[in-house]
Each structure stands twice: as C-alpha cells, then as structure tokens.
A protein has these predicted regions:
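TRNA-recognition modules of translation machinery and tRNA-sensing kinases, especially anticodon-binding
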Residues: 1-420
Length: 420
C-alpha cells in the first residue's frame, strides 16, 4: 500500500464517538422491540451465492444492474456481498429446514449491507440495516402488526412526527401482469419523454418506471393507469381489511397508487415511511408482502412479509442528546486513596452505572477533564473520606457538594442520577 493510502475506502465510514453511541442505541431499540413481538434473531453471512439475489431481485433492478459487489472465488463460484436482507433470510429459512417447523415464524436481523452507489449524505457503499420478516403470515393482521411495529421503532427514536406512512396494494400475480401491459401501452406513447433508465424498463418491467425518482418521469405518472383498476375481488377486499384495521388503531396513512417498491418479489401490501424534507421525500423505512418468493426458491407456498430500515438514515434523524448517557467520575486526591476509589468504580460498574475512573494520579488533571467527559457527578475520595468510609459527591451541573456514607451511594444515585 502506497504512503497516504491509510484511509477509508470511498463510500465507507468508521463509527466511533457519538456515532457509535447513536448506532448502538438504534440497534438496542430494534432488538427490544423484536423481543416484544416474539421475533427470533437470525444472522446470515454477508455474502451469498450470486444466484440467491439474481433469481429474486429482478434482473432489471437498480441493485443488480448497477450496485452489487460480485466476485468469483478460487473455486470459481460467483459470490455477492449482501445488497439486502430478504433474499438471504429466505435462503436461510429454506436451507435450515424451517419450512417444516411451526406455521408462523418471525425473524429479526441487523448488519452491514453493500451497494456500489454514489456516496452521499446518509447513503454509503457499506451501510447497516435492521430487518424484520414473518413467514406463514397469511392474515391481514400480520400486515398491520408490521406497520405498528415499524411505527413503534420510529416513536422510540422520537422521530415518528417526521415520518409519513404511504401504502399501496400490488394485488396478485395476475393483477401485476394486466397492469404491466397497460402501463407499457401508456408509457410507450411518451417514450421520447422518458429517462434512459425508464426507456430500458419499458420493455422488461414497466412497473419499475413508477419507482423512478426522475422528475421528468414523475410528471407522466399523473395520468398513468392505476393498479386498483385491475384488482381481483380478493385483492380489493384485502386492501379494505388492512385500511379498516389501520383506521381502528388511528394510524394515519396515504394511499399512493404509484408506490411499487424497487424489487420484483413484492406482491400485496407495500408500505414506506418517508421524510418530507425540503420538498424531497426520502425513505426512512420500507417493506411489504412477498407471498411468492419462498415458492420461487423452494417450490413451497409460504406467505411472507417484511420490512427494513437503514440505520445510518435513522442516525441522521436522531438527536444525540436524546441518547447520550452521562458517566459518573470517581476521583482521588492522592495515590493513597487510589485503591479505595478503584473499588468504588468497580462497585458502580457491577451495578450497571457508567463510570469513569482516571488512572492519572494528579487530582487537578482529573478534575479538569470532567467537563470534557460530560459527567453529571464526581465522587471524590480524600484521606478523610477513606478513613471514615464516606464519599464526597459533587453535582457538576449545580456546583454543589454533599457527603454521604459509602453504604448510601446506591440510594443517592437512584434518586438523583439522570440516566436512571
């Protein structure tokens, strides 16, 4: 490696400091909510045989045509770094014999995703997702549970007020086939007005044109045929059941007939939570039903639904002050009290308190660093405190001090420590 090359690969980022605190907070919330809804954690490898994704994402999808990291290993196998979770989770579900287990199964995953995209704010070539999947999910209650769950994640992160829920229903396979024919006929009339990407999709997958972010394409969507015109009675009834249940739970939503999601495996309900910032709608969290994907990969008919959210996108919307936990500092006047202070720090950590212990012997230097560490309290042990089994506690926000017995420390913190 040449000199000066010890830096990040373009599109990657190191996580440390406030960033890693935000990251871990989001993962902790995602895990806790998964547990509350009886999801089991499942981790898949970060690379799969390329066929896992190529068979299922759609050959003309942006992910496959522009964004995947694909390589050949020494055994001449083509492998792909994971560009999304669902196909990998379905592969694991089939490979590990889950088809023969209980009818309804729920899986939670998180980890890195890789897409060779143009790096920009909130979008890197390696980023992270939280991901939830339900297999055997035939009931419309599963659809609504996923939306409620997604909304709860945003609420726990205090960003639900920034999110707009959009839903659509893609119907069954026949609905999509009929709709694709009509869309192709409509957009062919405006071929010269379409972007190059949409012209390419016109022959292969006209539904994907509706996923375009090009303003020139979007202007044509207004008068385009709507998928509801091609619903079967079952699809129409299913959408009504879903919206009735959303209304029952007072969940606000917008029905967006142009919402199709970017991957071919979706059918039935699709949804997105978007952030309408400066007139540009950015997707925060998205998902939908994919009732045909398991059958496509295994021959077994298993209904399924899932959603995912980009952790870095959530981090951009989350305030650091909401999650920053403040440590308690343990300080000592001289080296004679260092062991006593070290024992207090050990005691606090064993009781799940965040504790900073300074190894520097200079007391003035210890106290000078407290402001940098954003400590709420400083516990100070001098010669008198060590002899009398007492602690001097200084509230660094208020600048006041008090003396307590060692045995009263937990009681004091339970009443005064803001992280409780």
């Amino acid at each position: 490696m040449a000199e000066g090359k010890f830096q990040n690969v373009r599109g990657t980022k190191d996580l440390f400091g406030d960033d890693i605190e935000q990251f871990n907070n989001i993962i902790d919330i995602a895990k806790k909510i998964a547990q509350n809804y009886c999801f089991s954690e499942l981790q898949t490898p970060i690379f799969e045989f390329s066929e896992v994704f190529e068979r299922n994402l759609g050959q003309d999808s942006d992910i496959l045509t522009k964004e995947v990291y694909k390589f050949k290993d020494r055994s001449d196998n083509y492998l792909t770094l994971r560009p999304e979770f669902t196909a990998a989770i379905v592969r694991s579900y089939i490979a590990n014999g889950q088809l023969n287990q209980i009818a309804l199964q729920k899986f939670f995953s998180f980890g890195p995703i890789f897409r060779y995209d143009r790096p920009q704010k909130g979008r890197q070539r390696q980023f992270h997702q939280i991901n939830y999947e339900i297999f055997g999910a035939k009931n419309h209650y599963c659809d609504v549970e996923m939306i409620i769950m997604a909304q709860e994640i945003l609420a726990k992160l205090a960003i639900s007020d920034q999110a707009i829920l959009k839903i659509n229903h893609l119907g069954c396979a026949k609905t999509k086939e009929k709709y694709a024919v009509k869309l192709q006929q409509y957009f062919t009339k405006y071929r010269n007005d379409l972007s190059q990407d949409s012209i390419a999709r016109l022959e292969t997958n006209p539904l994907r044109i509706l996923d375009s972010k090009n303003q020139q394409d979007q202007a044509l969507f207004v008068n385009a045929p709507k998928i509801e015109q091609f619903y079967s009675p079952e699809s129409k009834d299913n959408l009504q059941l879903i919206t009735d249940l959303l209304d029952e739970f007072n969940i606000k939503y917008q029905l967006d007939q142009n919402l199709v999601r970017g991957l071919d495996y979706y059918s039935g309900l699709v949804f997105e939570f978007v952030n309408d910032h400066d007139g540009a709608q950015n997707t925060i969290l998205a998902g939908g039903r994919y009732d045909n994907l398991v059958a496509k990969m295994s021959g077994n008919d298993v209904a399924a639904i899932g959603f995912a959210a980009g952790v870095e996108r959530l981090m951009m919307m989350t305030q650091i002050s909401q999650i920053k936990k403040r440590p308690i500092a343990v300080n000592y006047i001289s080296d004679n009290e260092k062991l006593a202070a070290f024992k207090v720090a050990d005691f606090l950590r064993k009781h799940n308190y965040i504790c900073d212990f300074s190894f520097a012997g200079n007391f003035k230097r210890q106290m000078k660093k407290l402001g940098q560490k954003n400590c709420q309290f400083a516990i100070i042990i001098g010669e008198n405190e060590a002899k009398s089994q007492k602690l001097m506690i200084k509230n660094l926000d208020q600048g006041v001090e008090c003396e307590i017995a060692n045995d009263d420390l937990l009681n004091f913190l339970s009443k005064n420590y803001e992280n409780n």
